[in-house]
Regions:
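Long, low-complexity, compositionally biased intrinsically disordered regions
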Residues: 1-666
Length: 666
């Protein structure tokens, strides 16, 4: 039998799941295995499946799967449509040739895209006029995909545009699909063998300045951000919030006037960290606040450098509009969503308590989060993990998979659900759900993660539409486990992945809002009948070590959301298991501690002490050949406050670069 529908042969079970849902695919495969195989025939250029119960499904040439006609009476997608494709694939499996796969040419779709409604093409042109940038992925053997600022497009068939899926509310043949095809065509014309590229769309009819600071609005934004940075470094964030209110407000309004989404989002995140510091929030992290402040200024500096390279004919690594998030919408409506939990974190401060649950869309790999908070007075009777969200207990959501209709995603990755858009189903999280996920979220081991962290762009140019320090790693064996009472932290060292240096450090601090999480972690790592096989969590550098803070631990049979534990589990083992940091690590930790001290208390209140500490530290850094960082610390004595602030920001960024480099060296 000759293959008349090559696009159907390209649809993998993962693609069919994305185009329909996991339930239809699972049931279809089971029915085919049980012998319920429909009769496949062709009639008038249409593929027809006739089932034993009389149901007839017809898919015409050029139709999307959901456009197929089926006599079962189902509204929209049904299992018969999925079984038609799977049966056709099985029928063709024995007759397919083993010819080498032809190179993908998305240009074949341009003519078809030109026939789309005017409204769709105008929306695409409007996005191009804003200078939109698109991240393209085309690795051999994998599904071509395009990541736009607020949506993701995947081409499940290289033969038919009808099987392209976007996660926006339209789902397919939308303006995002149009732009993705155009970007691939333009990029392949210059780099035929591309596997990963960031491509900027340019309009022939609209010209915009190549210098982001050439106009008054851009220049004002940079000045207000610099003034805010100077005020925070010199005065310290421990000063009353009223001291910084006006500076934050001016910078935020200036970023919004420029429509620079990642600059305004950086300001929002920094303000949230400062507020968390004053509210004594359990989720406040001094190192994170330090990075946010340094990256804010560096983002604008990088934008100017990218614009400069572009102006002299060089191709910048990242377009400046991507760096600042130019023209990115605040919200985007999403299509039918199937989300897999990555974990939950409970938190509290002096007035409120709350939680945040992270999910990933297995079809696109994007990460979303769901957040809620309540008055602290309700915490004793209603702990965060037992609160109900959309009629489901938070703990069940944290350890489950959810399906939602007509949701929205904010620019920072928050999942927005109105009361009427309730979650339609929640099922327990299974190991199979995580196995469907791919890199960079799911890494094959700690060695691969170190390499990924070393190679990825610095934080100051990465987009802020989702968290990028959340990963899933394999766990083979727990080597050591102990409770550090001085740090109130449970530490473990486990084998993760292949390689010589494959020891992963897990560290989970105790928290009053999830007091039994550490006990559950200890119990899971000690059990042998159903050992931990995978772990999700946030990576950072603790005591000089690349460390993962666990959120969910997956055994062979089930998932355990650690912060969802509401009862005592087992006593904690008492021992210190972390290795003594190397001299180089200790120096970087001293440098980071000095910068945190300056951030908290302000330069002007500890100038002489800070200069003395910086000079001593610079001498020690020079002894281990950290000459650049030593030079930066030497600039702290500079009498010009602007130069000193720039030096402190550079010190933060250098430490961030050096920690992964030391890890890579072992």
């Amino acid at each position: 039998m000759n293959s008349l529908r090559p696009e159907l042969l390209e649809l993998t079970p993962q693609a069919l799941t994305a185009l329909s849902n996991a339930g239809f695919v699972k049931r279809s495969l089971k029915e085919l295995e049980n012998g319920n195989v429909p009769e496949i025939s062709h009639e008038n250029d249409a593929l027809i499946a006739t089932f034993s119960d009389g149901v007839r499904t017809q898919l015409a040439n050029g139709q999307a799967l959901k456009e197929a006609q089926c006599s079962c009476g189902a509204n929209g997608m049904c299992r018969h449509r999925v079984m038609l494709v799977l049966s056709y694939q099985r029928l063709c499996a024995t007759t397919q040739s083993t010819e080498k796969e032809e190179e993908w040419d998305p240009a074949i779709w341009l003519e078809e895209l030109a026939t789309l409604p005017d409204a769709t093409r105008k929306r695409a042109q409007a996005l191009v006029a804003k200078g939109i940038t698109i991240e393209l992925f085309c690795t051999p053997g994998e599904i071509p995909s395009a990541r736009l600022p607020m949506s993701d497009v995947r081409f499940y068939s290289r033969s038919s545009i009808r099987f392209a899926r976007c996660d926006c509310i339209e789902g397919t043949l939308c303006e995002h699909v149009v732009l993705a095809v155009q970007a691939f065509v333009q990029a392949k014309a210059q780099q035929a063998e591309l596997t990963h590229l960031i491509w900027q769309m340019r309009s022939e009819h609209v010209t915009s300045p190549n210098d982001p600071f050439a106009n008054d609005e851009g220049n004002a934004c940079r000045q207000y951000v610099q003034q805010l940075s100077q005020a925070l470094w010199l005065g310290g964030i421990s000063q009353p919030l009223i001291h910084y209110e006006a500076a934050f407000s001016r910078a935020q309004q200036a970023a919004e006037r420029c429509n620079w989404r990642w600059v305004s989002e950086s300001l929002r995140q920094l303000r949230a960290s400062v507020d968390a510091f004053h509210a004594r929030a359990s989720h406040y992290h001094a190192g994170e606040c330090l990075r946010q402040l340094a990256a804010l200024n560096s983002r604008l500096n990088c934008a100017q450098e990218m614009a400069r390279r572009d102006s002299i004919g060089e191709v910048p690594p990242v377009p400046w509009r991507t760096v600042v998030g130019s023209g990115i919408a605040g919200e985007a409506k999403l299509d039918h969503l199937r989300l897999v939990s990555l974990g939950m974190r409970c938190w509290q401060d002096i007035e409120h308590y709350g939680l945040r649950i992270w999910f990933t869309d297995p079809d696109t790999g994007s990460i979303l989060h769901l957040s809620r908070s309540w008055p602290r007075s309700e915490q004793e009777n209603s702990p965060a993990a037992t609160r109900r969200l959309f009629s489901f207990q938070a703990g069940a959501l944290a350890g489950g998979q959810i399906v939602s209709q007509a949701a929205k995603r904010s620019a920072d990755g928050e999942l927005l659900l109105a009361t009427r858009n309730r979650l339609s189903s929640v099922v327990p999280l299974s190991p199979d759900a995580w196995q469907m996920l791919s890199a960079p979220l799911r890494q094959p081991g700690i060695v691969a993660l170190r390499e990924y962290l070393r190679q990825r762009p610095p934080a100051c140019i990465r987009p802020l539409n989702q968290v990028d320090n959340l990963f899933i790693l394999p766990v083979a064996e727990c080597i050591s486990l102990g409770w550090d009472s001085s740090r109130q932290t449970l530490d473990a060292q486990v084998i993760s992945g292949e390689g010589e240096d494959n020891l992963l450090t897990l560290s989970l601090p105790a928290s009053a809002c999830s007091p039994f999480a550490v006990e559950r972690m200890a119990a899971l790592l000690q059990q042998t009948d159903d050992p931990v096989s995978l772990v999700s969590g946030f990576v950072s550098f603790v005591e000089g070590q690349l460390t993962l803070e666990p959120r969910v631990m997956m055994t062979k049979t089930r998932a355990w959301a650690l912060d969802a534990e509401t009862a005592p589990v087992a006593p904690l083992p008492s021992a210190s298991v972390l290795p003594v940091p190397s001299t180089a690590h200790q120096l970087l930790m001293r440098c980071q501690a000095l910068l945190i001290q300056l951030l908290h208390n302000g330069w002007r209140y500890q100038e002489q002490s800070a200069i003395s500490q910086a000079e001593l530290l610079a001498n020690d850094l020079s002894a281990v050949v950290f000459y650049r960082l030593a030079h930066v610390l030497g600039q702290f004595r500079d009498t010009e406050s602007e130069a000193r602030v720039e030096a402190m920001n550079n010190g933060v960024l250098l430490c961030e670069q050096l920690f992964p480099m030391l890890q890579q060296q072992g």
